[in-house]
Amino acid sequence: MRAFTDYESTQEFTENIRLPAGAYEVTIKSAEDNDDALCLLFDSSAGEYRDYFMNKFRNDKNIYPDTAKFKGVYRLWYPKGNESDETNKMRMKTVLKLIKEENKLNIDYSKEWDGAALKGSRIGMIFRDQEYHYNGYHGFTAQPYGVISMEALRTGKYTVPEPKRLNDSDSFPDSEKLRFFEINVEDDLPF
């Protein structure tokens, strides 16, 4: 067998665990103003998937050191002067009010406020599967969908929405598109 020169420094693949759609307890790590959106950086904070997003980031950083991104981000879009403004404002108010009530924070969101005040806040977050096509790969990944109270999380009083499919998706292609061919089991295998 042949050896290769950088064997010792080559990264190994690690198990890539997929977060299932569902509801999880999350802790906000920071709140950042990012031009068009308030970005809440969070991680799961209880159960089997505790620290899921930080673990995924570390794993991705080992494999893709220049392009890895932290995926535990919930974006609340600021009004932009278009038809989605009312929805964006309602979503932002709903999320911020829930965070405030669940964590007994004393923040007046109608005035300028410091995003650091949200650090350490715990809430329930619903994730739904979202279909993707990226660099030739196709699949589903769980994405933040909305927030719920810790009581709703504990009692299971929430609904996980149906997966969000791509507009041009053909998730169940017919067999002709798969380009499979039948193998006659009576024939010898080619190796």
Segments the model singles out, each with a brief description of its role:
Residues 1-191:
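Short beta-rich binding modules
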